[in-house]
Regions:
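Active-site adenylate/phosphate-handling loop in enzymes that bind or generate adenylated species
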Residues: 26, 56, 79-160
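A conserved beta-strand->alpha-helix junction
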Residues: 30-31, 35, 43-88, 94, ...
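ATP-dependent adenylation/pyrophosphate-handling site
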Residues: 5-9, 13-50
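Short glycine-rich phosphate-binding loop at a beta-alpha junction
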Residues: 3-9, 111-114
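Phosphate/ATP-binding catalytic cores across multiple sugar-kinase/actin-like superfamilies
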Residues: 1-6, 100-104
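Flexible, glycine/charged-enriched surface loops at secondary-structure junctions
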Residues: 2-6, 161-168
Length: 172
């Protein structure tokens, strides 16, 4: 039995809209957001995720994936030896995040929300057992263009107009 939801909050538009939908549907007390930065995660993304979580009053934590990624790369070093870096290394980042979210889900009884939109899913811009790992996707039938429109709409229709539900810098 799930008592709430957890999602990876990247500081991007898709996870930001998913978080807003989850809070609208369940209330902030039943939603957890996790930022899982890697060495290339921008300060802008970190700040946007933190700001939105605070604005919406959800439980928020930061779990860096650098150590997990390094361990995976060490374990795979014999297999990757002599091969050029490619999308495989990027997919390991997504899969590390998926493992962390599933661990939180199992331990706390929270449903993992995935955040990919219909456009990304249609063209295969996602990672199996990574950002696709979860129990429900609120944006599964929402195109990327509509994601932006919904984000703007949600911000314009906030009960508390002085609080951005989705940080404007994420929409821009």
């Amino acid at each position: 039995k799930f008592t709430g939801v957890v999602l990876g909050l990247s500081g991007g538009i898709d996870s930001a809209l998913t978080l807003a939908i989850a809070v609208d549907a369940l209330g902030s007390e039943r939603v957890e957001a996790v930022m899982m930065p890697f060495e290339y995660t921008s300060e802008l993304s970190m700040n946007a995720a933190s700001k939105q979580a605070k604005n919406l009053g959800v439980a928020y934590k930061v779990i860096p994936i650098n150590g997990i990624y390094s361990s995976l790369m060490s374990a795979l070093k014999p297999e990757f030896s002599g091969l050029q870096p490619d999308v495989s290394e990027q997919n390991l980042q997504a899969r590390a995040r998926g493992v962390l979210l599933m661990g939180i889900s199992n331990k706390k009884g929270l449903l993992v929300l995935t955040t990919g939109n219909k456009s990304e899913i249609a063209v295969g811009y996602s990672t199996l057992y990574g950002d696709m790992a979860g129990g429900f996707n609120a944006l599964k039938d929402v195109s990327k263009t509509l994601v932006y429109k919904l984000a703007r709409y949600r911000n314009c229709n906030s009960i508390e107009q002085d609080i951005e539900v989705i940080p404007q810098e994420v929409i821009d």
